[in-house]
């Protein structure tokens, strides 16, 4: 599904407008759609989406997305179940909100560059697996971007498996994004052993099963995250 737009509009600059010319598959301003049992793939390198999705209340199940930078870009609410995303870096990009349930992601660089505003949640991962394929495969990064950042960005990991992810987990996170909501609960390695969080990025907050039970419960609820 393709919706052309002015060439002077940059990615994520305005809601509903982004350059879909580089994506293998682009669903632009599409809502209430279901994507099941399908693979979206591009062989292009650089900023090359396998799948670019813009819209509200979209659902994906057993979808395999293969790209390079920005392999999966999502702008608008979407639920992902048993999906696989393979990318080169900033593998999941966009404004969200996205709820990932039992998904597997692999990346050579950072898994995410989160860009949601305070208007909605960001990227939430429940029982997902992250496979880092390179030394820079942090979960998410928030560097200054040409004088701009995303202070309301949100990334939450619940009961996730981390394999090949650097000990700092997240980063770099510039001070201009120090208010980002980066939460982690019960991350473990592929053997099920608790991850060493002693050297985690200072901007990441670890959730406690008892003290933060209410917060964990909310983020475990996809309807609450997506406002569906």
Question: Where would I find each of the regions flagged by the language model?
Answer:
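Sequence-level preference for short, compositionally simple segments enriched
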Residues: 1-228
């Amino acid at each position: 599904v393709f919706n052309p737009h002015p060439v002077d509009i940059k990615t994520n600059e305005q809601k509903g407008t982004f350059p879909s010319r580089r994506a293998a598959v682009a669903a632009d301003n599409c809502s209430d759609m279901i994507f099941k049992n399908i693979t979206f793939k591009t062989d292009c390198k650089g900023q090359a989406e396998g799948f670019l999705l813009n819209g509200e209340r979209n659902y994906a199940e057993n979808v395999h997305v293969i790209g390079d930078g920005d392999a999966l870009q999502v702008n608008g609410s979407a639920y992902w179940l048993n999906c696989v995303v393979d990318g080169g870096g900033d593998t999941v990009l966009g404004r969200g909100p996205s709820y990932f349930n039992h998904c597997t992601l692999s990346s050579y660089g950072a898994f995410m560059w989160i860009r949601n505003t305070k208007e909605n949640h960001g990227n939430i991962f429940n029982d997902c697996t992250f496979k880092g394929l390179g030394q820079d495969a942090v979960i998410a990064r928030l560097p200054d971007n040409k004088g701009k950042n995303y202070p309301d960005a949100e990334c939450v990991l619940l009961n996730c498996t981390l394999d090949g992810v650097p000990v700092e987990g997240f980063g770099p996170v510039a001070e201009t994004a120090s208010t980002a909501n980066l939460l982690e609960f019960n991350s473990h390695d592929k053997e099920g052993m608790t991850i060493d969080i002693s050297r985690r990025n200072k901007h990441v907050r670890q959730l406690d099963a008892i003290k933060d039970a209410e917060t964990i419960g909310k983020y475990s609820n996809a309807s609450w995250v997506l406002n569906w």
